[in-house]
Design a protein with these regions (language model features):
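Donor nucleotide-sugar binding/catalytic pocket of nucleotide-sugar-dependent glycosyltransferases
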Residues: 34, 138-178, 185, 193, ...
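Nucleotide-activated donor-binding/catalytic signature segment of Leloir-type glycosyltransferases, i.e.
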Residues: 232-253, 264
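Nucleotide-sugar-dependent
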Residues: 197, 267-284, 302-303
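A short, well-ordered alpha-helix in the C-terminal region of glycosyltransferases
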Residues: 319, 326, 333-348, 357-360, ...
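Conserved acidic donor-binding segment of nucleotide-sugar-dependent glycosyltransferases
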Residues: 102, 307-318, 326-332
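A short, histidine- and acid-enriched strand-loop-helix "catalytic/donor-clamping" loop
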Residues: 8-11, 95-97, 105, 109-127, ...
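Conserved donor-binding/catalytic core segment of Leloir-type glycosyltransferases
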Residues: 4, 182-211, 220
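Short hydrophobic beta-strand element within catalytic cores of glycosyltransferases
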Residues: 285-295
Length: 377
């Protein structure tokens, strides 16, 4: 079975382990097209050729780079004519121009098509995106949703085709694993890891909650963005500047080592009218490293963590503080949550598991399965 995937996300080296895992299914002949760079608001994301065994990774230019709704691959028609895939996996939202154009061009070579969506809030888009969305939902063969809320959104918006709930990427458990040992005398180390430092990630709440902790502790904050100056100012105002380290953007290759130094990882996301946490990938990466995780009850966070971590109400500084205090004072609690977290990742969130479920979708598409159920992890 020939599968062609379009994915700007697969620029990231660690994400490419999913592609290798798909390619390990011997019946799949996989080709993936990525751009050389994506101009994200947080900064340019350049292609990392980190995991490229078993499949073809092609690099094609895109037009309107950085424009989420209007970018597209101008060479796709030629690629489709040359490869003639059985399945075109469009790793993109259904209301974007890239998806609409890819679907239209795939029909020329009779390829089955699927889209991927994280969209966990119902939004109504202006013309022409509402028209693009309507046509994609009517003509696409399959939908993969990154979370249960996205599945519900697209059913509400009229998508009647088959779908599955499968996270976009899992974790390579061989890369993200516990450190050989943690120095018990180094004090309690807390971490926050977001690519962008923006208000909805709740890092200010974490600073305030941590400032109440007694004893010896440190806080590492990964990421960069418009809120960094105000967060640095807040750390000074709280009198904890010497305990807080702003580490900037941590690359995917650096992330395993970054997480392994932590005792606890916090994702303090807060829901906004136009956004709520779609998944929280850093949670499963930390869990794989046997780091205790603490998350706000925003969006998908509670479903990702399950019983393998601690949950607190959004914006509840004292609840977050008490979770951190309990973790700080109990190595047993940290160890138990760490072990439970890694086991949860091994059961549900490895790249191998995600790849297996994705390949099963490809087979359903080719076999013209009529299954229209929603399944969750």
């Amino acid at each position: 079975m020939k599968v062609l995937m379009l994915s700007k996300a697969c620029l990231v080296g660690s994400y490419q382990t999913k592609l290798e895992a798909i390619a390990q299914h011997k019946e799949i002949d996989l080709t993936v097209i990525v751009p050389p760079v994506w101009h994200d608001p947080a900064g340019a994301v350049k292609l990392e050729r980190a995991h490229t065994e078993g499949y073809r990774l092609l690099v094609d230019p895109i037009r309107f780079n950085g424009q989420f709704h209007t970018y597209y691959f101008p060479k796709l028609r030629q690629r489709l004519a040359a490869i003639r895939p059985d399945v075109l996996h469009i790793d993109e939202e259904p209301y974007n121009l890239a998806t609409w154009l890819a679907l239209r061009q795939a029909r020329r070579v009779q390829a089955k098509t699927l889209f991927f969506s994280w969209q966990n809030l119902r939004r109504e888009y202006p013309f022409p995106f509402n028209l693009l969305e309507k046509q994609v939902l009517a003509k696409i063969d399959f939908g993969i949703m990154g979370n249960q809320a996205a599945a519900e959104v697209w059913r509400q918006k009229g998508y009647g085709g088959p779908l599955r709930v499968i996270p976009q990427f899992g974790v390579d458990a061989a890369l993200f694993q516990p450190p050989a040992q943690r120095d018990p005398g180094r004090g309690f180390v807390i971490g926050s890891a977001n690519r962008r430092l923006v208000p909805e990630k709740g890092v200010d709440l974490l600073l305030r909650a941590a400032a109440r902790l007694p004893g010896v502790w440190r806080l590492h904050i990964a990421g960069d963005g418009p809120e960094r100056p105000s967060l640095e100012k807040l750390a000074r105002q709280l009198g904890i500047w010497e305990r807080v380290q702003f580490d900037g953007v941590v690359t995917s290759a650096q992330m395993p080592g970054y997480l392994q130094q932590l005792d606890a990882l916090v994702l303090a996301s807060r829901t906004l009218p136009n956004w709520k946490e779609q998944f929280g990938r850093v949670l499963i990466e930390a869990m794989a490293c046997e780091v205790a995780v603490v998350g706000a009850n925003s969006g998908e966070i509670p479903n990702v963590i399950g019983e393998a971590g601690l949950i607190f109400p959004e914006n509840d500084e004292m609840a977050l503080h008490h979770h951190l205090l309990n973790l700080m004072q109990s190595a047993t609690l940290r160890d138990d949550l760490g072990a439970n977290g890694r086991q949860r990742v091994l059961n549900h969130y490895t790249q191998s598991q995600i790849a297996h479920e994705t390949v099963a979708v490809y087979h359903k598409m080719i076999n013209n399965a009529s299954d229209k159920t929603i399944s969750a992890n």
